[in-house]
Regions:
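Helix-loop boundary and gating motifs at the non-cytosolic
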Residues: 1-46, 107, 232-236, 300-325, ...
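Interfacial helix-cap and linker-helix signal at transmembrane-aqueous boundaries
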Residues: 26-27, 56, 60, 156-165, ...
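Central cavity-lining transmembrane alpha-helices of secondary-active solute carriers
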Residues: 35-62, 82, 342-348
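Hydrophobic/aromatic positions within or immediately flanking transmembrane alpha-helices
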Residues: 37, 75-76, 102, 174-178, ...
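Residue-level recognition of pore/gate-forming positions within transmembrane alpha-helices
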Residues: 43, 79-83, 181-185, 255-259, ...
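C-terminal ends and interior cores of transmembrane alpha-helices
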Residues: 61-62, 73-96
Length: 348
């Protein structure tokens, strides 16, 4: 159960960075509530990490996969990316590099959402088949671990920032991020002691990928990407948010690539290297989307995605803006650390 607790901590700790630290950092640098609120959109990636879960199941990292296992290698890679992001944050000023800081925050969110895919699977593997009765206890321990990583990690983060500020350190948030890197390193040391089973599972997945590509599913996926991209583009234009507009254009380009792929297959057939490459992309991207909408229907599928997205966005904004509210009515970072984080961890 301690291994499951550690996995929960690893999963929850990145939220300290993009939910607590980033919000207060931007607030104390004098940025507006609307800017901080818009930055909360990076949490939307957690609602859609299932879209790239099939890709994660099929990726082999050179050396690492064979050395420590497939799932642990993915977690270690994502943790390394988060460390690099913290290094970048530690040398930036929000008033001068706002877009870059939010972009780095998005990279942390994507890395966190990606590692959650493998953390959940690795957590389940820690409970043996003959211990299936312990599954509920394992799920509870995972929740405890997540809240420990988020709340207790948030307490440590805010206390460090408060003490550095009181000591006269100018860029105390940037120095705080350096300290937080140490916590991530310690978590990865603990990760090395967690065993991983089912290493033959990777080859079994590849063996089932062979030739189940449906051209119509590729066309449907292209339409979906283009529709999402067009919606994001219009939202970005309406609110004058260039990074949202660029994200929409990226989705449109991805959709166009899939549509060109479907045309290529119809025109030249499937027995060539280019088609085989697109077949792989289809199996890990288009097929899961197509299966989701085929099982639920287009209307129900869109409704489910919209519900999850709106739920996560509401949760993200509430958490972020509550810290801004506490700061505006006079609470210090130390107060927030004690009453919101430490006591919140105990009660949760």
């Amino acid at each position: 159960m301690l291994r499951i607790l550690l996995l929960g901590i690893i999963s929850g700790f990145p939220w300290v960075l993009i939910a607590s630290a980033l919000s207060l950092w931007l607030k104390e640098e004098g940025l507006s509530r609307s800017t901080i609120g818009w930055a909360g959109l990076i949490f939307g990636v957690y609602a859609f990490n299932f879209l790239w879960a099939p890709i994660i199941d099929r990726i082999r990292l050179p050396f690492l996969t064979n050395k420590i296992g497939h799932r642990k290698s993915i977690i270690l890679l994502m943790q390394t990316i988060i460390l690099i992001c913290l290094i970048i944050w530690s040398v930036l000023e929000p008033t001068q590099n706002l877009a870059l800081i939010i972009g780095v925050g998005l990279a942390i969110a994507i890395s966190s959402a990606t590692q959650d895919i493998t953390i959940d699977a690795l957590r389940i593997e820690q409970i043996k088949k003959e211990e299936s009765a312990s599954m509920a206890a394992g799920a509870a321990m995972a929740v405890v671990g997540w809240w420990t990583g988020f709340k207790l990690g948030g307490y440590v983060c805010l206390e460090i920032a408060e003490k550095l500020e009181n000591s006269g350190v100018d860029q105390y948030w940037q120095v705080t991020f350096i300290f937080l890197m140490g916590i991530i390193v310690l978590c990865n040391v603990g990760l090395s002691f967690i065993p991983e089973s089912n290493k033959e599972r990777f080859q079994n997945i590849l063996n089932t990928d062979a030739s189940n590509t449906n051209v119509e599913s590729v066309v449907k996926a292209s339409y979906l990407f283009i529709a999402i991209g067009a919606l994001c583009f219009l939202i970005g234009q309406f609110f004058e948010k260039i990074w949202f507009t660029n994200g929409g254009l990226t989705f449109v380009v991805i959709g166009a690539v899939f549509y060109i792929f479907s045309f290529f297959i119809k025109k030249f057939g499937a027995e060539n290297p280019i088609s085989q490459t697109f077949y792989y992309l289809n199996n890990v991207v288009a097929n899961p989307l197509s299966s989701f909408f085929n099982n639920n229907g287009v209307r129900i599928g869109i409704a489910i995605l919209a519900f999850v997205f709106l739920f996560k966005i509401g949760e993200a904004f509430l958490g972020r803006m509550s810290l801004v509210f506490y700061k505006e009515i006079g609470f210090s970072k130390g107060d927030i650390a004690i009453y919101s984080k430490a006591l919140g961890w105990i009660t949760t």
